[in-house]
Amino acid sequence: MKKTNLLFSGLLSSGLLFGSLAIVGCTDSKPDAETTNPETEMSTNIAWQDSQARFTVIADGVIRMEYDKDGQFCDNPSFIATLRQYPKANFTVKETEQMVLISTSKMCLSYKKGSGKFTADNLAIQAEASLSKSFTWHPGDTPQNNLGGTYRTLDGYDGSKYYSWDHNKPGQGQELPLEDGILTRDGWTLLDDSKGLLFDGDVNDLSSAELPWVKERKDDTIDWYFMAYGHDYKQALHDYTLFADRIPLPPRYVFGYWWSRYWSYSDAEMRQVVKDFQEYAIPLDVLVVDMDWHWVEPGKGGWTGYTWNDRLFPSPEKFLQYLKQNNLQITLNLHPADGIPAYEDKYGQLAEYLGMDPLSKETIPYDGSNPKFMRGWLDKILLPLQKQGVDFWWLDWQQQLNDNRIPALSNTWWLNYCIFDNQRRTQPEHRPMLYHRWGGMGNHRYQIGFSGDTYSTWASLAYQPYFNATASNVGYGYWSHDLGGHMFVNYNDKLDRELYTRWMQLGTYLPVMRSHSTKNANMQKEPWKLGSEFQPAVTASIRQRYKLAPYIYTTAREAYETGISLCRPLYYDYPEAEEAYDPEFRNQYMFGSQMLVAPITEPMVDGVSKVKIWLPEGLWFETATGTMLQGGQIVERRFLIDEYPVYVKAGSIIPTTGSDVKNLASCSDKVCLDIYPGNVESEGQYYEDNGNDRDYDKKYAVTTFKTKYEGKKQIINLGERKGSYNGMPARRSYSVKIYGVPAPTEVLLDGKSVDCTYIPEELVVLIELGEPDPECEHSLQITYPEGMPELNNGLVGQFRRMKNTMTQMKYRDAGINFCEGLGEMGSISEALLYFPEEFASRIQQFQDNYNQLPQLLDKQKLSPENKQFFLDDVLY
């Protein structure tokens, strides 16, 4: 941190020492009790101002610092900071003849009165003792450990290295210049909005259809936001949303599967895609139609286009109607940069609106900072297509980065705002929705992100988990990546099906699950075209996504409330653990609050993926194998193609979809509570709302669940549903699925006996609860038998692998007759089901036999090749 010199005479008498390790007058200061205010009460929170300086306490961890030589302070919303009213903050102001000291529970700001523009000689901020990281800041100091933000696009990147298809383009092989984020390990951040663009009106006043417009700032002003948080990164993100606004909750369908391919699909071909998904019982929510929906041939269309190609889509209305009948959403690709040529259907209407002569046939240029053009483009060009049934736009801006009229105005940022906020004002029945690239700070308000055209390589797969989670550091928590990569390194390459499978398995645990690829006949990513080795795993990844939809949607609500995104770096939860920052483990991330994902980013060796994983403190349940692992250590784990490294905190309650679904359109789907092993008290929630209305901020419902153990009894409480919304079902069907337990001896629901189903291959008990009254609390009590062996030591994985391998052995040796000990291992699941009274002895027998597997294979008299195959295949 930069050091400064002693300030001025009289400094010590004021109790302030700039440039030293402490600001004496601030030490141990506490807010006065009378400054406490209800959080719901809003205020400007201006703490102090004079003719040139103004300080606003946004929260105890955020102070806004403004300087203007004429005293014309900025109350307009900016592109970053759209909110100017805040929950009332707790702070104290102390003044001497020379100094003003503003104290919160986290920091103390000291400023020399009347000293003009902020410098290291007249302004300082010191951390209070409550922070986990001490610091003293002066203007000019720069944090040394920024944790990163995000970047506009991954177009042309192979992993983090840039390689344009045009080899003459500069920058080949350069590292992606990831932008800084909000968070630093130094414990503080300064956001400089001094040159940031403004709005000329309140963007949250939706009473008018007219969009507040861009406004440039005065020169030579200072507008800083100082954030103090120590290592409480989650609080910092929440504080950021107090002035930058919240992360909107996307429609529920966003969290389903998206099918996308750059391909000149016809109406009939698109319908066949839908039918294929239905035939293979693969859920689907969003169809993405790339640029061939409009004319692309010279004289009728091109890169930009707004007129349907009626050779491919004879009746767009009927095509869109078909999608609605199948509960599917559709987005169309837009490239607005080339303007609106005379051959577009709506050219005449827009020309007249803009005062041009339609007979001139002059192309109407794209002119984003012209409010007349933007209003005409939105109303005359896009709105008719939306009325036909287009749900949202894929805005694929790849051209000029900045506006011609206002050089500081990013075309990407501005388009995101204009389209998204126009929907807020003109489509009150649905949530705004947009799919576009990152435009810069403040773009967290305009999801969803489109990360662009990456190469289909293991390097690209390896980079995306880190890139994705790190974007949470600027609140940009909804990146959508081209799963499987967009393009080959060499056009004639073939799809690497293993790579695509691992990418899809990652996609299950990303904010958006969307396949996409360029126009290449070898890029066939339809699950049913992947062959028997990979199709089951890819299909399972999509179904698992839908199973987790209630958990994902609940976590998305959390992002709206707190600013903490669905995928978040490990240092949010484990800020004092060095491993959380270690580049070796940077691909690991938390998926919501209960799941840790450790992506597989390298090809298998001999059919096995080995992954080195850091598990934080605590107990973690490996879902692929049913293994409970002790945290606080680095482990190496092995996985087959149908397995993926996901770890759930011990005792977690995860709301999941309780039945097979085709899409996420319904509010009435059954919910299953997945309860994971762990003799701990724990709690979980299920969030629900209408799914796509605008009232989710107030109209929603939450149900809380708790579990605890009392000896051999597990008690699960279902809380009362609190809240309501339009379309809420009167009752909902529930089930409970408890992992890693033996078959219970008794199950009571509100004191009455109920049946259960035991699933031995998963070591799971499934209890159907029917439709419990949501206005009452309910108690589920499960009693387990005494004397049970340990079940959460990998048995589930061993069961599955043994069964599969023994089946494969019959194809290697059709005459094989499994010997005693080995044969029983292949039918363990059935034995547990048929002979529940022998549960403990059968489990013990399996474990003993498994421990002696090499000897049993010798007893079986397998050939050396077959013995090695067997051991390798079960990952012995």
Model-based region annotation:
Residues A650-Y876:
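C-terminal low-complexity, glycine/proline- and small-hydrophobic-enriched intrinsically disordered tails
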Residues F420, M441-G449, Y463-Q464, A471-H481, ...:
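Catalytic core of carbohydrate-active enzymes
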Residues F55, I63-M65, L101-L109, L596-P599, ...:
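Short, well-ordered beta-strand segments enriched in hydrophobic/aromatic residues
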Residues T150, P283-V538, D573-E579, F585:
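Aromatic- and carboxylate-enriched substrate-binding clefts and catalytic-loop regions
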Residues V24-G25:
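C-terminal motif of bacterial Sec signal peptides marking the signal peptidase cleavage site
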Residues I58-Q98:
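A low-complexity, Ser/Thr/Gly/Pro-enriched, surface-exposed linker/loop concept
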Residues P77-N90, L354-D357, E622-I641, E746-G770:
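Solvent-exposed beta-strand/loop surfaces of large extracellular or lumenal domains
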Residues K94-P251, R261, D267, V274-E279, ...:
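Catalytic and substrate-binding clefts that recognize carbohydrates or anionic sugar/phosphate headgroups
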